[in-house]
């Protein structure tokens, strides 16, 4: 850290170089730019070094003073060059100032000179060296304060006992402006000023004094009133009550009959009082109050009653001599009114009210559980009741009953698999505050679909026999006459679709269903319109049959329902020869017709068309997977 004692003629890098050359515990007392001189044969000789910096250091840790002359370096990598280093061992060491810029001192049996650049730095350096112990020497030379004389010890004198010398009469002075506090009185002039108000200006001054010092004046009046208050005076002439001197017959205070208040008797003219009458006789009964009548214990209020007695308006209670002012000023304590009984709490004379309420709550809770339990078993949403229910809580509102959701139509296939749309699963909407501890387990399902298809299917295995939905078993046998080991070709499916004649009975039903569906699935073909919510007509089915027939004639291949290998393919061509664009186009048409057909009413012809389309979709998906 750069200190202020370093010379102002040094640059920052030179000051840092100087600090690197000294110890961290050294303190710089004075410094200056100078030139080192040695005396030889009565002449001053300049050493080989250049201009340097003279430092006067103090080290309190090692307790020494030192004079160092070093040449700082502007390069931070170089250490400063020390030209002269002298440790001061003599306490009387001093420097001599030959002229304004030259200091001379004796060291190592010869004279050393310091030729300073600035005369002020030379003077400061000289004063620091000569006055390095000024504080300690000043304290030593300062005489001690004159204290008490030393006590002499002898055989008849104890030095530990304090001895006070008698003071002379000259040392005692008369008090200045001495007055007795109790005897302070107003002079005649002051009394005239105090008693008389000559003009309105003086009256205004008095009013201002009263307003400003109101608290002090009131406090003074209260003190005077308390000092003039007459305490109870004992009458010695009254007859003493004779009591037994036994332990149980103690002296009891006599109760004075003060049923009628006694008014102080004032004799004579009030404006001209008789000063011969003592204050005790005139104020004897002025502070006597009437005592409270003794009440019968049967009349006292019971704190357990809930009726609050209100009487007529009466004067505030006057304290007696036996009561304190604090207890007399408190309002009469009236028992608190008990809260009105609740509608479902019963007050029994000899049974605890809390236990009775608990028993009633348990009974109500059991009845409520018996009423709600059959409903819970039917619906399936179990409501958890808390163990302790407060009687003031509101009853839990029952969950609204939802109409049963119609499940999606189950389409039987020849492989014994039930295909159900993922969007057709019913979603259970249970309120957040109702718990469902026993949810229905979900069946083991597997995902089946195509990356390019628009609908994903969940297939769940079933061991049940497929339900017969058609009234024409001959057509079903014609289409699904083969087993899963022998796949059905597209040509056989197309032959069955040509014999289907759609009826117009499902048109009105399809219009109602289309109002509930916000957006139909996208259709990329020009044959079926995307905005048409009606089921497919015969005109829409015929072009589709032609497209399927053409694509089947190109491949002449039978595509199985499940994943097939090259051994399952029959015909001259392979599945890879058919263009993917034709399959995508036909697949989109099949999916669109299937969705519209599911919306309409279930009829024999429409169900047969739906099964045929489903079979074609499976063939195309199986082919695409194999491709």
From Swiss-Prot:
InterPro entries on file: PH-like_dom_sf, WH1/EVH1_dom
SUPFAM superfamilies, per database record: PH domain-like (SSF50729)
Annotated region described as Disordered, given as residue ranges: 310-347
Residues annotated as domain WH1: 21-136
Gene Ontology cellular-component terms listed: cytoplasm; nucleus
Signal peptide interval: none
Protein name from the UniProt record: Uncharacterized protein B0280.2
Provenance organism: Caenorhabditis elegans
């Amino acid at each position: 850290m750069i200190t202020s004692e370093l010379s102002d003629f040094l640059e920052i890098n030179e000051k840092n170089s100087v600090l690197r050359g000294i110890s961290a515990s050294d303190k710089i007392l004075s410094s200056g730019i100078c030139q080192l001189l040695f005396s030889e044969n009565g002449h001053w000789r300049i050493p080989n070094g250049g201009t340097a910096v003279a430092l006067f250091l103090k080290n309190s840790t090692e307790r020494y003073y030192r004079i160092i002359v070093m040449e700082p370096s502007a390069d931070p990598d170089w250490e400063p060059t020390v030209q002269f280093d002298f440790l001061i061992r003599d306490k009387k060491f001093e420097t001599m100032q030959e002229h304004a810029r030259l200091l001379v001192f004796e060291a190592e049996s010869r004279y050393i000179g310091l030729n300073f650049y600035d005369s002020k730095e030379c003077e400061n350096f000289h004063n620091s060296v000569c006055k390095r112990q000024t504080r300690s020497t000043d304290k030593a030379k300062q005489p001690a304060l004159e204290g008490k004389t030393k006590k002499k010890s002898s055989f008849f004198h104890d030095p530990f006992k304090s001895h006070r010398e008698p003071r002379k009469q000259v040392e005692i002075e008369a008090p200045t402006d001495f007055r007795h506090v109790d005897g302070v009185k107003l002079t005649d002039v002051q009394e005239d000023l105090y008693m008389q108000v000559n003009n309105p200006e003086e009256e205004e001054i008095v009013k201002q004094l009263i307003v400003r010092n109101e608290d002090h004046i009131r406090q003074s009046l209260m003190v005077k009133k308390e000092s003039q208050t007459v305490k109870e005076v004992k009458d010695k002439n009254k007859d003493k009550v004779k009591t037994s001197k036994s332990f149980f017959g103690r002296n009891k205070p006599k109760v004075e009959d003060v049923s009628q208040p006694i008014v102080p008797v004032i004799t004579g003219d009030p404006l001209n009082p008789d000063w011969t009458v003592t204050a005790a006789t005139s104020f004897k009964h002025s502070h006597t109050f009437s005592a409270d009548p003794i009440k019968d214990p049967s009349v006292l209020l019971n704190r357990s009653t809930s009726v609050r007695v209100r009487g007529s308006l009466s004067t505030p209670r006057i304290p007696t001599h036996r009561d304190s002012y604090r207890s007399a000023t408190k309002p009469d304590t009236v028992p608190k009114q008990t809260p009105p009984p609740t509608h479902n709490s019963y007050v029994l004379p000899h049974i605890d009210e809390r236990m009775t309420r608990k028993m009633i709550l348990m009974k109500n809770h059991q009845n409520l559980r018996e009423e709600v339990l059959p409903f819970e078993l039917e619906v399936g949403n179990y409501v958890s009741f808390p163990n302790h229910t407060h009687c003031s809580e509101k009853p839990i509102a029952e969950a609204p009953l939802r109409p049963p959701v119609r499940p999606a139509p189950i389409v039987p296939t020849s492989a014994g698999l039930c295909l159900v749309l993922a969007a057709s699963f019913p979603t259970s909407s249970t309120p957040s505050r109702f718990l469902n501890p026993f949810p229905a387990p979900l069946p083991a399902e597997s995902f089946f679909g195509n990356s390019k298809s628009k609908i994903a299917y969940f297939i769940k295995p079933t061991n049940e026999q497929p339900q017969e939905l058609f009234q024409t078993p001959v057509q079903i046998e014609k289409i699904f006459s083969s087993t899963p080991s022998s796949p059905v070709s597209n040509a056989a499916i197309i032959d069955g679709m040509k014999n289907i004649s759609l009826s117009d009975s499902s048109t009105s039903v399809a219009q109602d269903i289309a109002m509930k569906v916000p957006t139909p699935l996208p259709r990329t073909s020009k044959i079926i319109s995307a905005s048409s919510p009606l089921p497919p007509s015969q005109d829409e089915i015929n072009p589709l049959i032609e497209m399927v027939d053409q694509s089947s004639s190109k491949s002449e291949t039978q595509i199985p329902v499940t994943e097939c290998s090259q051994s399952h393919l029959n015909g001259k061509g392979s599945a890879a020869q058919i263009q993917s664009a034709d399959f995508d186009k036909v697949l989109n048409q099949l999916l669109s017709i299937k969705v519209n057909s599911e919306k309409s009413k279930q009829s024999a012809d429409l169900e047969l068309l739906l099964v045929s389309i489903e079979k074609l979709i499976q063939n195309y998906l199986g082919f695409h997977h194999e491709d």
